[in-house]
Design a protein with these regions (language model features):
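Conserved lysine of the Walker
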Residues: 18
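Phosphate-binding P-loop
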Residues: 1-5
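Post-Walker A alpha-helix
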Residues: 21-22, 26
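C-terminal accessory "lid"/substrate-recognition subdomains
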Residues: 113-122, 126-129, 143-145, 157-224
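The conserved Walker
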Residues: 14
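Conserved nucleotide-sensing/catalytic segment adjacent to the nucleotide-binding pocket
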Residues: 34-40, 44-105
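Conserved ATPase-coupling elements of RecA-like P-loop NTPase cores
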Residues: 136-141
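Short hydrophobic/aromatic beta-strand immediately N-terminal to the Walker A/P-loop
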Residues: 8-11
């Protein structure tokens, strides 16, 4: 942790509401005239979308599984090193994972690819992370140890899955079958790597659904 170069992380699952929480932080930064360097959790994925599809097929053929919640599909070491480097020097690198055509076209790329790594802006007052693994701990890596303020957006599973289904189908062009396969395939990693983070957070938020979420596989509008 660093007093000169603090790290703030908002962590939660896909569809949990981390984007809404992050928007609130950005408004706070603006009101306090703080300049934040931002890194996205998706930028630490190991694979492009075609590479991930191939990795999923290989894992399935060998009776194993791989998901974006687990270490096989993410570079926890690089994430940890990013937090360490920023805490020491206020420097680091970032890139983006391009989910949609709208995101990809300005880069002259296709969805499911990464932008090149680029230096973080300087100088900045804080590093802000939003993603799946801001508080992850494994036998090899302790990302949570390097975060000064760790905020969790904890699971409300049915609401979370409905929002993920709606977003991935309407905004990212995935089929219902592909989204539900992703949810089912991710369960072991979800339990082992995502949910333990919420015992390490400094603050947790938990949303309360105000719509019918009884059928978690039903696409419906539930807000952001």
């Amino acid at each position: 942790m660093s007093a000169r170069h603090p790290v703030i992380a908002v962590t939660g699952s896909s569809g949990a509401g981390t984007t809404t929480t992050s928007l609130a932080f950005r408004k706070i930064f603006a009101q306090l005239n703080l300049r934040a360097a931002e890194v996205e959790g998706d930028s630490f994925h190991r694979y492009t979308r075609p590479e991930m599809d191939m990795a999923i097929r290989k894992a399935r053929d060998s009776g194993k599984h791989i998901s974006y919640f687990g270490p096989e599909a993410n570079d926890f070491g690089l994430l940890e090193q990013t937090f360490i480097e920023y805490g020491k020097s206020g420097k680091g690198q970032s890139r983006k994972y391009l989910h949609t055509y709208d995101e990809a076209v300005p880069w002259n790329q296709v969805p499911g690819t990464f932008t090149p790594w680029q230096p973080l802006p300087e100088p900045t007052d804080v590093l802000f992370y939003e993603g799946l693994h801001g508080g992850v701990v494994t036998p090899q890596h302790d990302v949570a140890r390097h975060v000064d303020l760790l905020v969790g957006v904890v699971p409300i599973v049915n609401l979370e899955w409905i929002q993920k289904l709606t977003r991935d189908m309407s905004e990212r062009g995935h089929s219902r079958e592909a989204v539900m396969d992703s949810v089912v395939r991710s369960m072991e990693d979800y339990i082992n790597f995502l949910t333990p983070q919420f015992s390490r957070t400094h603050i947790n938020f938990q949303r309360v659904p105000t719509v019918d979420t009884s059928n978690r596989s039903e696409e419906r509008r539930v807000g952001k």
